[in-house]
Amino acid sequence: MTRAERKREHINHALSTGQNRETGLDDITFVHVSLPNLALEKVDISTKIGGLTSSSPIFINAMTGGGGQLTYEINRSLARAARKAGMPLAVGSQMSALKDPSERCSYEIVRKENPDGLIFANLGSEADAEQAKMAVDMIQADALQIHLNVIQEIVMPEGDRSFTGALGRIERIAAEAGVPVFVKEVGFGMSRESARQLFDAGAAAVDAGGYGGTNFSKIENMRREKALQFFNTWGISTAASLAEIHSLSADQSIIASGGLQSALDVAKSIALGASGAGMAGTFLKALTSKGEEGLFDEMTALLQELKMIMTALGCQSVSQLQKAPLVIKGDTHHWLSERGIDTSRFSRR
């Protein structure tokens, strides 16, 4: 099977498997504010993500590319909607275009349709610094995502089996790429120990990529003769991942992703420490079911609903929302307690 064929299979399986809604965000409850003293029109949702200023904390996370005409059309529609909504956009892994130049157009269309927007390039941790620079140049990217997908590769029948040297490559890429480097998980979450290593290696931001959204173990298991079912429930939830990473330092740039489906999910993620929130499966489903205009409507509704939530909490800015008090309960509270993370610092601030 070619890379392009595998990319198309991934899209179809992602739509059919959906999201399992085990992000841990249902364990998060905001402390209600009866006197917010704020008008909705005064709310400012601009933010800084890894040193980049964005008018929107929500962005379209990496989905696809390199799968022929289908992925070209998806990326074209995503780029158009992102331009109209003022949202950043990440492309899927560009390794396929580095190996097969005929696939470059499925990525280059993003910059062509969105010449002034924030665009993130994307490669896996197997890439070297020279490939990273080529990926950035391909789409004149403002930042580069490096994705960590060990479990997906292990389950993938034709996937990688050696993961040595990844941190060293990331460190070199961060030093030489010429743009901020964001390192992201792909649905299996991230511990504070892993995040610390990545920040120390020069990552401008880490993306939690928590468990609870699109499940790449399930997707790859659908392609196996003998499924590795034990990996289907493997990982750290989005909520727990965010709290873990935030426990390192309040000054680090954190991105939330992994099953985010609503403005409330985004608001909770920001209050857990994120400065930006990536959504992929939700936007892909909107595009395939409602078309490009329907996707744009969904995006603008999310941004407006986020402003409403911030108004209710009395938070005029994203930085204020990051300090909004919340209570953590259930499995997420249990996980964090066992990991030695004091949840009262969220509820008593």
Curated annotation (Swiss-Prot):
GO cellular component, one term: cytoplasm
GO biological process, one term: isoprenoid biosynthetic process
Coiled-coil residues: none
InterPro entries named in the record: Aldolase_TIM, FMN-dep_DH, IPdP_isomerase
Cofactor(s) named in the record: FMN; NADPH; Mg(2+)
Transmembrane regions listed in the UniProt entry: none
Pfam families the record matches: FMN_dh
A GO MF label: isopentenyl-diphosphate delta-isomerase activity
EC number: 5.3.3.2
Annotated binding of Mg(2+), by residue: E153
Subcellular location: Cytoplasm
Keywords: Cytoplasm, Flavoprotein, FMN, Isomerase, Isoprene biosynthesis, Magnesium, Metal-binding, NADP
EC class (word): isomerase
Annotated substrate binding sites: R6, K7, Q152
Binding site for FMN: A62, M63, T64, S93, N122, K184, T214, G258, G259, A280, G281
SUPFAM superfamilies recorded: FMN-linked oxidoreductases (SSF51395)
Primary location: cytoplasm
Protein name (record): Isopentenyl-diphosphate delta-isomerase
Protein source organism: Bacillus velezensis (strain DSM 23117 / BGSC 10A6 / LMG 26770 / FZB42) (Bacillus amyloliquefaciens subsp. plantarum)
Upper classification of the organism: Bacteria, Bacillati, Bacillota, Bacilli, Bacillales
